[in-house]
Amino acid sequence: MYHYTDGGLRNVWLANGYEITQTPYGEGVSFHNLDGLTRSICMALTRKSSPLTGAEFRYIRSAGMLVSQPALGKLMGIDGQSVARWEKTSKVPLWADKLARLLYAAQVNGDEPIAKAVERIKTVERLIKQKIVVRESRGQWRPSLQDDDLVTH
């Protein structure tokens, strides 16, 4: 078995799905379907009965949700420094532990509003200039966001 320690994880072991090879620099490890492995680990973390450690919380955020500390903070209604502190000290508040699990599970299981909210936060972080374009259709106003350079005037 291979002890998988990516992202500071200490309790993950791979029974298979990896190859150890010798390189000029020592042993190297390659993983089959790394995205699937990451998803599987994150789902296991959302289902575990004990509280998340700081490393587990960080793994769900960074490898699973692919968001920064400030982005997760925005989703949770707090500042990014709080997220950083929890990850460093392993003192994740119970409410944040549960919310991170729910956000990840909803995003990966295709909960459209959650997935869109996470994607919006990630997009905002990339500082894309956008315009809000509002169209009236059948008496209802419908907003949409468009990249500034794609909007026709």
Can you name each region flagged by the protein language model?
Residues S68-M76, V83:
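Short alpha-helical "recognition helix" segments of helix-turn-helix
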Residues T53-F57, D97:
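Short, leucine-enriched amphipathic alpha-helices that occur as contiguous helical runs
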Residues E56-A71:
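Short basic helix-loop element that most often maps to the first helix and adjoining turn
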Residues Q140-H153:
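C-terminal, charged low-complexity interaction regions
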Residues A100-G110:
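Extended, acidic-biased charged interface segments
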Residues M1-P51, N109-V134, R138-W141:
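N-terminal flexible/basic segments that precede or flank functional cores
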Residues T89-L102:
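Short, basic-rich loop-to-helix N-cap that marks the start of a DNA-contacting helix
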